[in-house]
Amino acid sequence: MSRTTRKFVIATVMSTFGLMNAPAEAVCSQEGNKYTCSGADHDTQNLTGDVLDVVLDGTSYINTDSGYGLSVTGSSLTITQQEGGIIVADASGINIENTGTGDTTLNISGTVVAKRADGIEIITSYEAGAITLIQEAGTISGEQNGIQTQYMGTADTFIAVSGEVKGESNNGINALNGSTAKNLSIMQSGGKITGRFNGIQASNQGTGNTSIITTSDVSGEYAGVFVDNHASAQDILVMQSDGSITGGHYGIYAFNHGIGDTTILTAGNVTGTNGSGIYVDNAESANNLSIVQSGGKITGGEHGIYANNHSRGDTSVTTRGEIVGENGSGVSVSTMDGGDIAFTQIQGKISGTQSGIDILNRETGATTVNISGEVIGGSVAGINTDFRGNDGKTTINLNQGADISAASGIAIRSTHSDATVNLNNGAKVSGQILLGNGNNTLNLNQGSDVSGLTVINGNDDDDPEDSITTTLNINQSLTGSSFTEGAAGDVAILNWNIINVGNAAQTRNATLTLSGDLNADQITIASGGRVNVSSAVRDVTLAGKVNNAGSLDLGIERNSDNRLTIEGDYSGDNGNLVLNSVLEGDNGTADRLIVNGDTAGHTWVSINNLGGQGALTDKGIEIVTVKGDSAGTFAKSGRIVAGAYDYDVVKKDSNWFLASEKAYRPEFGSYLANARAANTLFHTRLHDRLGETQYTDRLTGEQKVTSLWMRHIGGHNRFRDASGKLHTQSNRYVMQLGGDIAQWSRNGLDRWHLGLMTGYANNQSRTHSKANGYTSRGDINGYSVGLYGTWYANQKEKTGAYVDAWMLYNWFDNQVTGQNLATEKYHADGITAALETGYTFQTGESRDGRTRYWLQPKIQLTWMDVQADDHIENNGTHVVNNTNGNLQTRLGMKFYQQGNHISDEGKDRTFQPFIEANWIHNTHNDSVMMNGISNAITGARDVGELKLGVEGQINARLQLWGNVAQQLGDNGFSDTQGTLGIKYQF
């Protein structure tokens, strides 16, 4: 080659690699065993010695048309290329051969280029010490390998790069440890590594560990990172803390033929375009295999992750990012020789065109899968586990955030092992769950989303004689049967020996709604669990035994002809049976439980009345049919009411019936007590509003009267209804307030009074049924407003005739609360009015003239017409006030004396004790109807009353009065009342 041509080639290479300002001549000066190279040269720099320390400074430039750029041979070698240094060679840029026993150390900060070989090539003898190659910056490029080391010594190989490393036709970094070597370590802290074959290839035939750490981009047309441990090597560690690893076939390929563990840690993107993003194979001699993805995305043209452990060690895969298997599974894991498999998805998404996750355990180890992210399968399943060994156990835990589905419709498939699948709070499964030949358990736990479930199959073995037990635990709301094709909202429940609905720890939302028949050997409804019959079906059969400690509900739809048949035995463990019924007489209808086997234990019965009016029964309405030994007991869990009647659950022969009791409900008494109180609470008589005085207006001298009176009443009432079975007691309080607004006289002797009054009252009652022991409570609160008028024939002496009249408008809020029944609320209002007349005459006086004696016959007519609104109870009973007005007549005689003590002379003080007897007659008893059946208060038509009291004037302005009255009637009717009144005159 001519000198001109050589200059052109050099200039072209320098331009290509950015080296145009190289010095004119390279000179390697020697000082002892140290060489310092500066400037430019076109010849290979061959340096040989025992111990060599070679420094290529920042001005050095070596460019050769043939051979190496720098060739160093010796026993202990240190080569340093400073930043700015350049080597461009036809063969290897730097060729190092350690023929002795010392270490080989390279520190590269410049540019090394090989046009037909390796950028840097290191070969050692079998006795050589460790290799350390550190690239702090710059570029290392080779037509074959960017860096190649062949270490045959007995120590370690350590390669650390921070710049660009490139292998045009082979590997970016190709590192080999011979059989006597130990650890092989490659660390990338920046830059970029690329290779035509592999980005990084590490092969350890020695006895130590192999570790590769990357923080930036690594790529190769076959594998981004390729690691191979031979028979005597120990652990493999590949750790990606950032960046990307990309391979035309594999992103990371690790093959451990050694005797240690294999660990793959990724945080960035890993891509295997035509194969697997991560491919790991542990040979039989190796131990544990672990893959941890802490972020990023792993993509494979086949599988996202493929891990095969032939050893006895355990296999674990943990993911936090996205994993994609474009023509295979997102993650495929298999073992060959008995180790456990643990797969954990902390978050993220895993998808594959075959399975999202595919796990094959060929021996006796356990398989555990924990999912907290999205898993999407293709043609096979979302999660597919298989066991080919003996006594294998598989556990799949779907936790908060889990979302499992597949294009095939099979969300989870687990075959050939004892499998436990847990759908926990926040987990969702769409599609089928298919469990294989094993003792399998599926737990649908509280808070899981089963809305997308279509099939849950406990066993793919149809042999009824095998010893396999499959258990389905439902702690969630689920609808389905054993005879549906399976769809979201109507799940096919297949091949389960034991079905448990609810448990002691999870009692909310544990509901199985049957859309058809259900096959199981044993169905247990735990406390808090519920089994319903869907509104879409009328007749449902349960094939096995049933134990009920929760609720068996046939009454979710408003019809009363559902039938639930239990082919086996039924045992009640204080559970509840809920049925619909049209509560009538014997012609009434009801849902029915049919037990073809035996019954045992105790069951409570709840009845939903669907518009039944209530009637007396003879035989009753059948609700439970028992064809075997009827040792179990059934009893109502609360009140069963319709119209005027209570119903009970009674046994006749082997079967159970609803039968009405021949006694009215106690609520009758509460309605009656409220009706009576509404018409009597504000009833007044003349002497409830005593006296007044006159005063002279200071300005006009006109005589006027004004006053304010108030009375307080407390009373207690007792009565019985027409059946004699309902005993009612009530307590009342009344406060009335009034006063005269006008007073006048026509002849100076008589006196007319006109006044206004208002009041508040409360009455609380309790009714007890002697027939069944039930109670009911009534409560009425209300107000009144009205006026009164009085005429005295003799105002001064209050003798002769008098007439008193009043009229009130009354309104009340009413409540009736039956035992174990909802509170009923209704309104009442109406008019009460009275007309009273009597005659007062003196019968005598004391010797001293201080005391006079009076007799007063009287009669009062009172019209009572406070009516309650028609009311429909929560159970459908129509309640009507059946008393259309009542005229009460009171005929009585009052005897009293009037006087004062000598010490009260001149003090305007007088006292009037009295005794009064009355006969009271009502034209109607208070009456109420329930669904057309009438009941009334008895003993109140004719009542005798005795009243004792005293009326007194304390001074000219203040009057007080009080009395106690006792009324007695037939059939235990009685009323006791105390009154205290006060009046102040202005």
Language-model features: locations:
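Outer-membrane translocation/initiation segment of Type V secreted surface proteins
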Residues: 2-4, 35-42, 497-506, 578-581, ...
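N-terminal segments that cap or nucleate solenoid repeat domains
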Residues: 25-74, 89-90, 504-516, 702, ...
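Glycine-rich beta-solenoid repeat tracts in large extracellular/virion proteins
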Residues: 42-48, 67-74, 92-99, 118-125, ...
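Fold-core signature of tandem repeat domains
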Residues: 70, 79-81, 86-87, 94-96, ...
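Outer-membrane beta-barrel pore domains and translocons
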Residues: 150, 203, 255, 308, ...
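Extracellular beta-strand/loop-rich repeat segments of large surface/secreted proteins
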Residues: 441-443, 450-456, 462-620
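Outer membrane beta-barrel transmembrane domains
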Residues: 786, 865, 874-986
